[in-house]
Amino acid sequence: MKTTPFTDVHIALGAKMHEFAGYNMPIEYGGIIDEHMNVVNNVGVFDVSHMGEFWVKGPNALRFLQKVSSNDASKLAVGQVQYCCFPNNDGGIVDDFLLYRYEEEKYMMVPNAANIAKDWAWCRQQNTMGAILENASDNIAQLAVQGPKATEVMQRLTDIDLNEITYYTFKVGSFAGCPDVIISATGYTGAGGFELYFYPQYAQKIWDALFEAGKPEGIKPAGLGARDTLRLEMGFCLYGNDICDTTSPIEAGLGWITKFTDDKMDMPSRKIMEEQKAGGLKRKLVAFELKDKGIPRQHYEIANAEGQIIGEVTSGTMSPCLKKGIGMGYVATEFSKVGTELGIMVRGRQLKAEIVKPPFRK
């Protein structure tokens, strides 16, 4: 199993470790609900060093991005971030990723850990225009400092005014005495905060500085278990669950990151997605809350009010904030309106549920 620069720290803290995307990662330290609520109310730190990082450079960088990304990279100014996906050739999704415009002709993609090899092969295959690609996944460490108190904790460790870093923008500078740190107002929790990218040799120094600075705010480490419940309460898609090779961005409600500008004519599956956007969808991803007691899980069947099977759960959990079962899943389009009554099949029983508008945690 691969390790991150923080693996020994997690083990020393008594974290419950488990293999995730080929890495030995902390699932929880003292309890998922406790870590979840600490991020919502205070501040928590996630090791996300397993995520990938690809540099895209040179005069053909933008041309390459306008082909492989679903979004319109020409709209990005230096210092801005964009949520995107790679459409495949069959109307599905290779992966979703964040795109950073680092310099005029230098961008950074941040794909999912489980898909680094697949995404890298896809990018190289699509790079017919000679953009300079570099896979820096093993040379960059990453921490997500998330929660309403993240700014006050982190401000003690940098001269950069963190209030100037608005949502989906970033700055590069000194943090905890370490140079060239990317401080990005992004995250997968919906609780506010930042993601930090830095060279692995600074990992211990940055970790120690954060936990020292955050003592008054009750800073705690958080594992991948809480990361999943937090993202699900926001209705954020997880690759491999809610989106995959066979789901289209339009079905998944990601039409807002799918652009059809004139400089994106050679984007894979453009025609398929344009047709879907014009109204040709058989199924849609919806968010639902259980009205009965129970926990929906991936692959559970979804029925309509009459008991006919109309879809399948892609993600589900017991929401720590709402204290009820919540989930997402694909249903036939005619049953996808907010307020529609559903039945979730749990061990032969049909539990009542209702389609809601995400996020679950308001």
Swiss-Prot record:
It is an enzyme of class 2 (transferase). One of its GO terms (molecular function) is transaminase activity. The glycine cleavage system catalyzes the degradation of glycine. HAMAP family: GcvT (MF_00259). It catalyses: N(6)-[(R)-S(8)-aminomethyldihydrolipoyl]-L-lysyl-[protein] + (6S)-5,6,7,8-tetrahydrofolate = N(6)-[(R)-dihydrolipoyl]-L-lysyl-[protein] + (6R)-5,10-methylene-5,6,7,8-tetrahydrofolate + NH4(+). InterPro entries: GCS_T (IPR006223), GCS_T_bac (IPR022903), GCST_C (IPR013977), GCV_T_N (IPR006222), GcvT/YgfZ/DmdA (IPR028896), GcvT/YgfZ_C (IPR029043), TrmE/GcvT_dom1 (IPR027266). This is Aminomethyltransferase. It comes from Porphyromonas gingivalis (strain ATCC BAA-308 / W83). It holds the Pfam family GCV_T. Its EC number is 2.1.2.10. Gene3D superfamilies: Aminomethyltransferase beta-barrel domains, Aminomethyltransferase fragment, Probable tRNA modification gtpase trme, domain 1. Keywords: Aminotransferase, Transferase. SUPFAM superfamilies: Aminomethyltransferase beta-barrel domain (SSF101790), Folate-binding domain (SSF103025). Belongs to the GcvT family. One of its GO terms (cellular component) is glycine cleavage complex. The keyword tRNA processing does not apply. The glycine cleavage system is composed of four proteins: P, T, L and H. One of its GO terms (biological process) is glycine decarboxylation via glycine cleavage system. NCBIfam families: gcvT, PRK00389.1.
